[in-house]
Amino acid sequence: MKATKTTYKKDPMGLTPSQIVNELNRFIVGQEKAKKAVAIALRNRCRRKRVEGNLRNEIVPKNILMIGSTGVGKTEIARRLATLTNSPFYKIEATKFTEVGYVGRDVESIIRDLVEIAVNTEKTLAKTKVDIHAREKAIERILDSLVGKTSSSETREKFKEKILNGELDDTEIEISVADTTPVGGGSFEIPGMPGASMGVLNLGDMIGRALGSSKTKTKKMLVKDAMAIIIPEESEKLIDQEKIIQQAINLAENDGIVFIDEIDKIASTGSSRAKNAEISREGVQRDLLPLIEGTTVNTKYGPVKTDHILFIASGAFHIAKPSDLLPELQGRLPIRVELNSLTKDDMIKILLEPETSLIKQYSALIGTEDVRLEFAASAIEKIADYAITVNLEVEDIGARRLHTILENLLEDISFEASEMKGKKITIDDKFVENQLSKIITNLDLAKFVL
């Protein structure tokens, strides 16, 4: 049954678990156990906020371990969950980290990045609230450049009307704008640690705040370009930066979701212990322990507590087993959910049912060329058949196999669509077979092409 958008009765605690599952069903096929687990975890957060007194601080989120092969929906479930709740969401692979003391990223950068996302979210929200006022101030600055500060109100009103109507978009003006050239300092990459940066405030920002002003420079530009630069500048002046930072830290601490993928890759199997082939995997696990259990991480915005951040870890566990993780880490991921491998029926549903299904995406893309692309039921079944076959014979990459198959299937149509305006193309099982049968039957070729 096709999942559709539903309007729910207003609940003081937000979406109920069943409503969350219904929303996830709009985008993700199957995996009911995983959806149920994340829905309960999310609802428990809302419940905790309504608990009175000291007991509220004692209630911690029940972190989740998702077990399942690639392409079955682990990441998508967590990502859609964050979108549903407007929560700060950060996804990272466990293999990106090394034990403290070695060259590489340390696990505390997870929280620094999460807070950065929360700050940007709060800042964007605050800017939308002052957008009208910021636009007015931007127009006033442009009018100063166009007609001068001493011009009559009648003249200013006349030119303001022209700006609003877009009549002066291509008029060149000379105007002072903020100088965004880095003064030094700022967040900079640490040598030998790709992706890691020092959590320090921009030196220029600090000097600007101390002096109550910022450096500007005069530039020549078109009115439309000036509007695009000045509106954000004015928005920055109108919003309360300190308040935004406090709200962002609170949002990250109480609503943040961290998704740690490939956690099975840092599990220490017997062979890896004996060979000592990699920098301590156990060390990374031990570094993760306090973060997941609850600690305070210093960021450039201030200290952030991780006690109530929801951690969702996932892994395929083809070689290692969940029991190969440190016992302490296993204890901090109490909810375990096994995601099922995808069947042929699942593949058919993935192609057809989600609101943003692949078939709808490709039809919309080709449709922009005034070409109508349709898929017969027999074609959908054949595509699903081929996806399952290649997953079984080559390597199981789940629903991601559909992307490669459809790209190969529609390659010629995508190339020639611009010369087929007004036509209708129907994809049936014979077309699918003609395009893909040679690749499917030659498994050595399929390994490289599909």
From Swiss-Prot:
SMART domains: AAA (SM00382), ClpB_D2-small (SM01086). Coiled coil: none annotated. Keywords: ATP-binding, Chaperone, Cytoplasm, Nucleotide-binding. It is found in: Cytoplasm. It comes from the Bacteria. GO terms for biological process: protein unfolding; proteolysis involved in protein catabolic process. It holds the Pfam family AAA. Transmembrane segments: none annotated. One of its GO terms (molecular function) is ATP binding. CDD domains: RecA-like_HslU (cd19498). GO terms for cellular component: HslUV protease complex. ATP binds at residues 29, 71-76, 261, 328, 400. PANTHER family: ATP-DEPENDENT CLP PROTEASE ATP-BINDING SUBUNIT CLPX-LIKE, MITOCHONDRIAL-RELATED, ATP-DEPENDENT PROTEASE ATPASE SUBUNIT HSLU. Belongs to the ClpX chaperone family. HslU subfamily. A double ring-shaped homohexamer of HslV is capped on each side by a ring-shaped HslU homohexamer. The assembly of the HslU/HslV complex is dependent on binding of ATP. ATPase subunit of a proteasome-like degradation complex; this subunit has chaperone activity. The binding of ATP and its subsequent hydrolysis by HslU are essential for unfolding of protein substrates subsequently hydrolyzed by HslV. HslU recognizes the N-terminal part of its protein substrates and unfolds these before they are guided to HslV for hydrolysis. This is ATP-dependent protease ATPase subunit HslU. It comes from Rickettsia rickettsii (strain Sheila Smith).
